[in-house]
């Protein structure tokens, strides 16, 4: 199974890139984690946020291979514990489809992305900076993988 993290924003600080890559490289080849960056629309004083969100959403959806299971990261989503995420990941594997996880920009996800989603995951009730979300998602997915594979990384 392939995991895709599709996130709005490019040119992240080095610490974000290093943090994400640290967890990305830990995954085995049969569970690859890929990052796809979508350029953020220009936001200024007179920016048309609705149009920006729509365009970002179109680009995100275009990046998803046909047949992928789509999971949005969104506040109204389900709060998963590590064991619940591990169970979800196991179901995704048994389903035989690759998974695309969508992270929006400062205003969140486009309505079209939310409508296309098969599941929605609330990473935290806290407001997290979008660059940090990439690392937290990568670590959480790796931890869930480690639970499913009896790897010593996760301890209860």
Curated annotation (Swiss-Prot):
Catalytic activity entry: pseudouridine(1915) in 23S rRNA + S-adenosyl-L-methionine = N(3)-methylpseudouridine(1915) in 23S rRNA + S-adenosyl-L-homocysteine + H(+)
Gene Ontology MF: a single term: rRNA (pseudouridine-N3-)-methyltransferase activity
Enzyme class per UniProt: transferase
SUPFAM superfamilies membership: alpha/beta knot (SSF75217)
Compartment(s) where it occurs, according to its Swiss-Prot or TrEMBL record: Cytoplasm
Main location: cytoplasm
Residue ranges of the TM segments: none
Taxonomic superkingdom: Bacteria
Record-listed E.C. numbers: 2.1.1.177
Keywords: Cytoplasm, Methyltransferase, rRNA processing, S-adenosyl-L-methionine, Transferase
One Pfam family it belongs to: SPOUT_MTase
Positions contributing to S-adenosyl-L-methionine binding: 73, 104, 123-128
Cellular component terms (Gene Ontology): cytoplasm
Family statement drawn from the similarity comment of this UniProt entry: Belongs to the RNA methyltransferase RlmH family.
Entry-linked NCBIfam families: PRK00103.1-1 (NF000984), PRK00103.1-4 (NF000986), tRNA_RlmH_YbeA (TIGR00246)
Quaternary structure and partners: Homodimer.
Role description: Specifically methylates the pseudouridine at position 1915 (m3Psi1915) in 23S rRNA.
Protein's name in the database: Ribosomal RNA large subunit methyltransferase H
Organism: Shewanella sp. (strain MR-7)
């Amino acid at each position: 199974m392939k995991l895709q993290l599709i996130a709005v924003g490019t040119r992240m600080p080095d610490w974000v890139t290093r943090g994400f890559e640290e967890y990305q490289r830990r995954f085995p080849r049969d569970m690859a984690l890929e990052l796809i960056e979508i350029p953020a629309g220009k936001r200024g004083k007179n920016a048309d946020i609705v149009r920006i969100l729509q365009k970002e959403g179109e680009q995100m959806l275009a990046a998803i291979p046909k047949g992928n299971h789509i999971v949005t990261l969104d506040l109204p989503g389900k709060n998963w514990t590590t064991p619940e995420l591990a169970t979800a990941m196991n179901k995704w594997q048994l389903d035989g489809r690759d998974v695309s996880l969508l992270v929006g920009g400062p205003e969140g996800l486009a309505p079209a992305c939310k409508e296309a989603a098969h599941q929605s995951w609330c990473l935290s009730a806290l407001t997290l900076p979008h660059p940090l979300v990439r690392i937290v998602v990568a670590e959480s997915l790796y931890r869930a993988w480690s639970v499913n594979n009896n790897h010593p990384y996760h301890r209860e």
